[in-house]
Structure formats: C-alpha cells, structure tokens
C-alpha cells in the first residue's frame, strides 16, 4: 500500500493517463508556471514579514 491506500501501480497508471492527455510539453509549462507562482508567493510573504518588522521598529515606546 502506498499513500492513503493508493498502490504504486495505481499512481503510475494515473501518471501515464495524465501524460497521455496533456503531453510532456504542456506538463513542463504547467510545472514551470506553478514553480514561478510558488516563488512569487514566497517572495511576497518574505517582503510582508520584512515590512511588519520595520513597522514595529519605528513604533515609539
């Protein structure tokens, strides 16, 4: 048994169906778009944390 009761053979079959439907070039595009979206999200979260700490530094005591 694999993850959540899905066997490795079932996962391979699902992967083969996805590749057959979309093709490898479309999957590469989807993968790179998803990676860039995650990178931009992390960058936005880091800049938000930086802005929050800068605001806290400027508060009078």
From Swiss-Prot:
Regions that span the bilayer: 2-22
CC per GO annotation: TAT protein transport complex
Annotated membrane topology: Single-pass membrane protein
Protein name: Sec-independent protein translocase protein TatA
Gene3D superfamilies on file: 1.20.5.3310
Subcellular location: Cell inner membrane
Gene Ontology MF terms: protein transmembrane transporter activity
Source organism superkingdom: Bacteria
Entry-linked HAMAP family: TatA_E (MF_00236)
InterPro entries for the chain: TatA/B/E, TatA/E
Cysteine disulfide links: none
Quaternary structure and interacting proteins, as annotated: The Tat system comprises two distinct complexes: a TatABC complex, containing multiple copies of TatA, TatB and TatC subunits, and a separate TatA complex, containing only TatA subunits. Substrates initially bind to the TatABC complex, which probably triggers association of the separate TatA complex to form the active translocon.
Function: Part of the twin-arginine translocation (Tat) system that transports large folded proteins containing a characteristic twin-arginine motif in their signal peptide across membranes. TatA could form the protein-conducting channel of the Tat system.
Name of the gene this protein is made from: tatA
UniProt entry keywords in alphabetical sequence: Cell inner membrane, Cell membrane, Membrane, Protein transport, Translocation, Transmembrane, Transmembrane helix, Transport
């Amino acid at each position: 048994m694999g993850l959540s009761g899905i066997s490795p053979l079932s996962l391979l079959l699902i992967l083969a169906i996805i590749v057959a439907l979309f093709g490898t070039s479309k999957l590469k595009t989807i993968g790179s778009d998803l990676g860039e979206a995650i990178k931009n999200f992390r960058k936005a979260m880091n800049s938000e944390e930086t802005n929050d700490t800068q605001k806290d530094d400027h508060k009078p005591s």
